[in-house]
Amino acid sequence: MVMMAWVANHAGAQKVSLAGKVFEHTLLRDGVNASVFQNPAMQSFHYQHSLNTLNLGYDYRHASTPKRLERGDGHKQAFVDVDAYLHKGKATLWGNAYYVNGSTRNVLYNETTDLEQLYPYLMADSVGGKTSQEYYYFMGGFSYPLGKKWTIGAEGEYTAKMEYRTRDPRPKNLTGDLRAKVGVSYLLGVLHSLGAAVTVRKYKQTNELKLYNEVSVPTIYHLTGLGNDYYRFRGVNTSTYYKGYGVGGMLTYSQKDQRGWFAQAEYEYTNIDKIISTLNELPMATLESDRFHGTVGYLMNDGHQYYGANLDGEIYRKFGTENIFGTAQDNIYPQIASAEFYTSAQSRIGMEAFYQSVYSNKSAWGGKWKLAYMGFSEKYQEPYRRLKHAAVMTSLLLDGKVKVGKCLLMANVHGGYEWAINKHNDDSFLSEDKSAMMRPLIHTNEYFAHDRWNMGADVEVPLLVACKFLPFVKLSWQYDYYLLTAHQNSLVVSLGIRF
């Protein structure tokens, strides 16, 4: 898909300057109504002009104390990223591909890839260590008009990950995540586009752990949430896998000129099983989740001034069902019952507003402000445990661009603050339970209980002037402060070319 866009883009004559295309593709408006273009049938009017970007760089992160112990306290990653958006005749094509190779330091209490997605059903130990990674991602889509009113679109994406360690304990995780999306839109009158889309997904992860040191063998835990684990299967059951599926749908509305009202509503359901291979494919647990997301907003522009706002909300819930087994015969455990022990809910509602002034594609300045309320709660039935957290978040971004000859200089500064809202938790179990797997829970609970803030900047500088190519170097930096004294620095340096 990316190669098709590159060839076709250079086969046709360019009607606007390259700098003008970059101005359009980097408008602050783009993040405000981005959810509308999750429907592939709406992508035909996302941008007026084609633009491709090739980017390679280095990503570095280091924390004095990690935000979550399971994510490690820093990483070093090299990456290559290719992005394309192309109008070709009546069709619109887009694609993205990237490759990441690196390592994460001091990963603790987690030996499973895709932590956020599969939590709480992780495989863990108390040793951990440096974990190496390779990530691959491919996405491509198209939209095409059927007559004057109807437009169809489709998009597919695939993510593959490999994570491993060369010293005990040695995880070797392989994941495959395949998603497909089909959409349709109908033009009401001249400008009003109403659309719908359906999504399907297939997921699998092989999660295996090797232990070669027979003298010192750590206990392997199969976590079930809030510091609990499936006690019966503790020990050396180190081969597991996850498999599952997802389905969803969305409704979208927008004007083709991206003025006036826009809206999007989406629902997604996911079902993933955890299976312990070393116990004759024992189905330990099932994790179900559903996500509701909605956005409504208003945009205006006169070609020189762009402004607008949105109201955005999301609810993400998880339901964990554990299977109960009888006495094993020949290492086969008969399933005798199942029960829903774990539930969690994340909620967010917020608003976003922006203003940007563009002067004939020669310079631009603007800002974006966000305000949101975020809540999180999780509960385990037996033993009964419950934690709640909430925060109010605000952030501000100031953005500027200036054209120098045929090149473009871009920069922004941004910062944010989160006020923790104390909840009346019965968290006495955090100090009473002395098991090894309580430490990451205590750490995460402390993180959410305190205020945190961040600040950063992005600068992009062109290297030379060319007619059809715009090479650039980009520097991104962010500083995070949390847990009263902990801090984290993130730095990304990249070299790229737009064409």
Where are these regions (language model features)?
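Outer-membrane beta-barrel "beta-signal"
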Residues: 16-19, 190, 487-499
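Transmembrane beta-strands of outer-membrane beta-barrel pores
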Residues: 56-64, 99-103, 158-162, 200-204, ...
